[in-house]
Amino acid sequence: GKISSNSSYTIDSSWLNRVQQVVDMCIANDLYVIINMHGDGYHSVDGGWLFCDGSNQTAIRAKYKACWKQIATRFQSYDQHLIFESMNEEFDGTYGTPNRTYYENINQLNQIFVDTVRTSGGNNAKRWLMLPGWNTNINYTVGDYGFRVPTDNNCTAGGKRIMISVHYYDPWGFCGEESTTATQWGSKANNSSKVDSWGDESYLKSQFNSLYNKFCSQGYPVVIGEYGAIDKSAFDSNNTACRAEFASKVCTYAKKYGCIPIWWDNGATGTYGFGLFNRSTGAVTQPKIINAITAVYPSSGNTSGSTSSIDTGKTYMLKNVNSGLYMDVCGAKAVNGTNVIQYSASKAKANNTWKFVPDGKGYYY
């Protein structure tokens, strides 16, 4: 494992260095990053220890606190682009109704996480934190099964800085089951025998609506930290179209009800994989799914407003939000390599006005 067995529970320095390297690469490309404790609570893998049904909760909590103290301290200077999530799919390994005693152990771990991060210095006092309920299941987080939002008395942000974390893989027969039984979903389905008996669009809508009513409306953002559907196109030529529609509907209703969805790309691009890109070459392998997602979120970069508000037939003056100065062509020259500077301006001129040209992918140049 990557955590020492002695009472200090020291995380392997090479491992933590690699995590930081990846975080830095992401932030350098203006991405948001979520660090979580992923899989430590699985009963199905070697090395699992973060068990909500474990007999020695005192030792588990001590190890958990020590790990998050190290992580939070290492990243204390990072800004809002870095988010911490307490754990991933934590449950007792069975898929029935949650055991309330074990659920309370999850609540206790979430509280330890919040308290530890908040008192670890730097920006941690105001960092966004993600908290999952039982197995990141929507019903078991929204319903009366035992989930409790932790107190956050050490937050200095002047407002809530806790997000709720859930996953969405419904219906599982279509989304994750490695079989050829359910290969279609939604209005694109052309063979009813290939459609699961539950988990249709109306169910999806009701799930996200429940998240809004329970959390978003109370000031707690919701992140759908994982969703997706595995590739079964080798068995059904209509599978890709159905997967694309599924992605579109998840994003559409997430947007409507104030949630942020994240496709689970596990790097596997073959049969039964969730991957959208080839991670060795960077090549897109699922353009229809990517297009379905980006069609719901057409804006890009740090723009305020949608791309539909940009008139490509008009010219614009570009004002820097920090300096209040405008982008201006140095000396009004019209040759390649001419520098662009900041300059005060009272009216539009040829050297300080610009056109936006769409690249066809939701961006402009």
What are these regions (language model features)?
Residues 37-39, 88, 135, 226, ...:
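A mature extracytoplasmic/lumenal domain signature
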Residues 66-69, 73-81, 90-257:
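Extracellular glycoside hydrolase catalytic/binding regions
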Residues 32, 221, 260:
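Residue-level detector of anion-binding/catalytic polar loops
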Residues 305-365:
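Lectin-like carbohydrate-binding module/patch detector with strong preference for beta-trefoil
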Residues 234-309:
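Aromatic-rich peripheral "rim/lid" segments of glycoside hydrolase catalytic domains that contact
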Residues 1-128, 132-143, 270, 284:
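Active-site mouth of glycoside hydrolases
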Residues 6, 56, 139, 153-154, ...:
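N-linked glycosylation sites
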